[in-house]
């Protein structure tokens, strides 16, 4: 890449970054937090944060990258995607009408809410316990990270339930919403994330997500400022780099350490070059249509229920890894959101996907506002826990693609909804057995005096 070509790419990158950052800043000033702000920051991180890192790798370490015209296509496709997404998100689908009291779809009380978070936590802890009994601490047993996807590891399906510890702790926080509950959320979820990091053998997702949710709650409540958020972001990047070194068993120093930091940070937070690789092989792609979305559900179907289930699921990430890159190392390489749309339907699917994503984020914001207006604090805690708990799925949306997001968000909704139903059923059984007594002011006064 020549200096002139880099200058052209830099101008496009700067314009796109300023465009998205400006819109995000205005939205932040208006709302402080909503899921449009979160997705916009996530989109910036995924598709634009990596460009400076790539530039340093090219000019400092002479690393080979896709041709400049392909990198330009990747930057422009990301900028155009966001423009269509933003217009869709801001488009009002129906006229604003005065709030009319409606019969709520469901209600929650104190016992049901506490039962819900206990069940969610129980699912996570039991899954971790069973996985540990089968495999032990994989971080200290395996020689390479790719081995966690091999037949040596049993009970892999249980990992999908680990994440429900975070929604459980979110319910606990939203029931109190004070600084002590906020700090308890951080300590409990990060400790659980470190435990799963050692047991699973290097998966950092739970730690990243817990830390991100903690920061956004702090921003919403005004407990941390923007400069503190920036400092925490830098600390998070350094922390993820250190965990990556431990995961891959690397011991580096000097120039090698700087080089390793650049490419690991880029691959962890901003895999935008994967989109460029996909566009570089555009003519070799056999468009998959909506099949990757359907195929991604296969992993949630037990083999005993479907004996003939394909062992290798050809979703967009695996298609990109196996068919486009001809990489069979055992690791799936993230195609990114835009890359998954290209795999499914080419360039035409990029604006269509942007419209779909705009509607998805609009729905989450509607649900979040519903929780903000809710007068029943127990129901509000459940709604907020569901919304913030879905942040993991939004990260999957930006990094892995639309197909992975759809399967995971459906799984999340089903499990979360099942926990609600079980909690309500248990409450009904306890109430029928006379085990639940309503609190009265006189009983509370007696407890205080005693």
UniProtKB/Swiss-Prot annotation:
Keywords: Cell inner membrane, Cell membrane, Membrane, Transmembrane, Transmembrane helix
Pathway: Bacterial outer membrane biogenesis; enterobacterial common antigen biosynthesis
Protein name: Probable ECA polymerase
Function text: Probably involved in the polymerization of enterobacterial common antigen (ECA) trisaccharide repeat units.
Membrane topology field: Multi-pass membrane protein
Organism encoding this protein: Escherichia coli O7:K1 (strain IAI39 / ExPEC)
Localization, UniProt: Cell inner membrane
Protein's UniProt keywords contain Transmembrane helix: yes
Taxonomic lineage from the root: Bacteria, Pseudomonadati, Pseudomonadota, Gammaproteobacteria, Enterobacterales
Complex and partners: Probably part of a complex composed of WzxE, WzyE and WzzE.
Principal cellular location given in the protein's record: membrane
Membrane-crossing residue ranges in chain numbering: 6-26, 37-57, 63-83, 118-138, 155-175, 181-201, 207-227, 228-248, 341-361, 378-398, 410-430
Family: Belongs to the WzyE family.
InterPro entries per UniProt: WzyE (IPR010691)
A single BP term in Gene Ontology: enterobacterial common antigen biosynthetic process
GO cellular component term, pick one: plasma membrane
């Amino acid at each position: 890449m020549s200096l002139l070509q880099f200058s052209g790419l830099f101008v496009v990158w700067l314009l796109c970054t300023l465009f998205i950052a400006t819109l995000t800043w205005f939205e932040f000033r208006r709302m402080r937090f909503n899921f449009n702000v979160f997705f916009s920051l996530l989109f910036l991180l995924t598709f634009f944060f990596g460009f400076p890192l790539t530039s340093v790798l090219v000019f400092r370490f002479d690393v080979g990258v896709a041709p400049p015209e392909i990198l330009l296509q990747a930057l422009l496709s990301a900028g155009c995607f966001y423009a269509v997404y933003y217009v869709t998100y801001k488009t009002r689908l129906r006229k604003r009408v005065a709030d009319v009291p409606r019969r709520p779809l469901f209600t929650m009380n104190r016992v049901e809410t506490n039962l819900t978070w206990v069940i969610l936590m129980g699912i996570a802890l039991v899954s971790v316990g069973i996985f540990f009994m089968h495999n032990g601490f994989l971080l200290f047993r395996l020689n390479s990270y790719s081995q966690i996807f091999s037949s040596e590891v049993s009970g892999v399906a249980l990992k999908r339930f680990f994440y429900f510890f975070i929604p459980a702790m979110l319910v606990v926080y939203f029931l109190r919403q004070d600084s002590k509950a906020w700090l308890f959320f951080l300590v409990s979820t990060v400790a659980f994330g470190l435990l799963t990091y050692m047991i699973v053998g290097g998966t950092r997702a739970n730690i990243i997500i817990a830390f991100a949710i903690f920061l956004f709650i702090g921003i919403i409540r005004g407990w941390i400022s923007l400069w503190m958020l920036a400092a925490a972001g830098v600390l998070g990047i350094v922390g993820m780099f250190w965990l990556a070194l431990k995961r891959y068993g690397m011991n580096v120093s000097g120039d090698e350490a700087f080089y390793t930091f650049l490419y690991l940070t880029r691959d962890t937070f901003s895999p935008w070059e994967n989109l460029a690789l996909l566009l570089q092989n555009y003519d070799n792609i056999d468009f998959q249509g909506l099949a990757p979305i359907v195929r991604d559900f296969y992993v949630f179907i037990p083999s005993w229920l479907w004996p003939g289930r394909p062992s290798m699921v050809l979703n967009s990430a695996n298609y990109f890894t196996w068919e486009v890159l001809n990489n069979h190392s055992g690791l799936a390489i993230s195609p990114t959101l835009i890359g998954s749309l290209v795999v499914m339907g080419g360039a035409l699917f990029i604006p269509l996907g942007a419209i779909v994503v705009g509607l998805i984020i609009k729905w989450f914001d509607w649900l979040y506002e519903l929780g903000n207006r809710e007068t029943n604090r127990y129901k509000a805690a459940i709604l907020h826990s569901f919304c913030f708990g879905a942040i993991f799925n939004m990260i999957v949306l930006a990094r892995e693609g639309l197909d992975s997001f759809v399967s995971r968000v459906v799984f999340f909704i089903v499990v979360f909804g099942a926990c609600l139903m079980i909690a309500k059923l248990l409450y009904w059984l306890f109430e029928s057995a006379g085990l639940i007594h309503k609190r009265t002011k006189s009983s509370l006064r007696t407890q205080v005096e005693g």
